[in-house]
């Protein structure tokens, strides 16, 4: 395992927070800690960042998904020990993820992710209340690494995504901040091991391990584990600097994606109107929408559908294309009067000379 200078790793996390204006000394931060090596390192690093004035009040959240029996209970005990060691308040909860997935018919991993972030937002609200800080100023810190980002890049390459999807992970997404996105998993494990060698306080489980291992992460029938253990190692054989190279590539994509998203903000402000106060009721695309550049129109439609379907929904390419087809490119982008289509989410797309409406089919009828 490669050695790493503690200060170097903490310096890099501090630089991410500062350069990207993600947090400061007044920022309450909820740390999502599973007990694995990445999130355990995040807990130690966040405490050092707090001491430097790069973060404000801290708290931890641990969610027991009740999927791994006694192993999950041992994870919870380890995180409780870690929180006590660092003198950081701990929020913990148990959620029957398997039962919820069976009830809703959703994928277990998708349900786990959704419930985890719901719990994180609730815990952050409590932390901000205690810190007398507006909720909008609070942050949820996750331990996603350069490895996670590269894995997401390959996963999206396999299943398909829009250009913006190849940025893989953002340093910030709403209240969620990822300060370790430039660090590798190997570096974080070396950091913890070095902490122990230096005599700094560290948590250990009953077997003397410095972090918890989730055995299911090795099960290659799971998509991310397959990419992690089968694809990324082969790619590293070709290029040992894969994490750094793809990291730079994804940052370039992210810069251009941010610029395009800013342009879409302007397009939507001028040519897209929500029906009512929320997009739940639908929206209208003005006639002039069809004359805008296709890449911007496509992104705007994608965003409008995401707002209507919910953040966890996967917007289908066919749905986006069905909305775009309501405008006649050969006629300068004018709406095709009489055009009607039914797309995912039982949404109706209809066009007339006043524009293109996207609304629930029940409202259209």
Predicted features along the sequence, with ranges:
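Non-catalytic, surface-exposed connector residues within folded enzymatic/regulatory domains
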Residues: 73, 102, 225, 240-243, ...
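Core alpha/beta nucleotide-donor-binding catalytic domains of modification enzymes
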Residues: 2-229
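Residue-level marker of positions within ordered structural domains that often coincide
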Residues: 43, 117, 197, 236, ...
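PAPS/PAP-binding and catalytic site of the sulfotransferase fold
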Residues: 191, 227-231, 297-305
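Mid-to-C-terminal catalytic subdomains of enzymes
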Residues: 196-251, 255-258, 272, 335, ...
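AMP-forming adenylation/ATP pyrophosphatase catalytic core
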Residues: 8-38, 59-65, 95-97, 171, ...
């Amino acid at each position: 395992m490669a050695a790493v200078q503690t200060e170097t790793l903490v310096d890099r996390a501090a630089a991410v927070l500062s350069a990207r204006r993600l947090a400061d000394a007044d920022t309450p931060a909820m740390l999502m800690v599973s007990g694995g090596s990445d999130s355990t390192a995040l807990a130690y690093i966040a405490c050092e960042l707090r001491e430097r004035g790069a973060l404000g009040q801290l708290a931890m959240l641990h969610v027991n998904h009740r999927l791994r029996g006694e192993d999950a209970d041992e994870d919870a005990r380890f995180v409780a020990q870690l929180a006590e060691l660092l003198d950081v308040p701990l929020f913990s909860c148990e959620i029957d993820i398997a039962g919820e997935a069976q009830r809703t018919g959703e994928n277990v991993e998708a349900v786990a992710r959704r419930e985890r972030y719901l719990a994180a937002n609730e815990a952050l609200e409590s932390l901000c209340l205690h810190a007398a800080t507006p909720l909008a100023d609070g942050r949820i810190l996750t331990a996603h690494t350069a490895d996670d980002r590269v894995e997401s890049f390959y996963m999206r390459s396999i299943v398909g995504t829009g250009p913006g999807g190849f940025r893989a992970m953002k340093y910030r997404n709403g209240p969620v901040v990822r300060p370790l996105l430039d660090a590798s998993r190997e570096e974080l494990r070396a950091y913890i091991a070095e902490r122990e060698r230096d005599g700094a306080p560290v948590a250990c489980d009953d077997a003397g391990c410095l972090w918890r291992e989730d055995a299911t992460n090795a099960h290659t029938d799971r998509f991310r584990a397959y990419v992690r253990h089968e694809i990324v190692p082969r790619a590293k054989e070709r290029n040992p600097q894969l994490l750094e190279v793809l990291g730079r590539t994804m940052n370039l994509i992210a810069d251009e994606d941010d610029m395009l998203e800013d342009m879409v903000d302007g397009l939507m402000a001028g040519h897209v109107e929500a029906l009512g106060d929320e997009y739940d009721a639908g929206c209208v695309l003005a006639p002039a929408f069809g004359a805008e550049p296709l890449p911007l129109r496509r992104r705007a439609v994608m965003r409008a559908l995401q707002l209507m379907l919910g953040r966890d929904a996967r917007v289908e390419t066919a749905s986006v294309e069905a909305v775009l087809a309501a405008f006649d490119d050969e006629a300068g982008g004018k709406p095709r009067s009489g055009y009607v289509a039914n797309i995912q989410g039982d949404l109706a797309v209809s066009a007339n000379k006043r524009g293109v409406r996207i609304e629930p089919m029940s409202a259209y009828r």
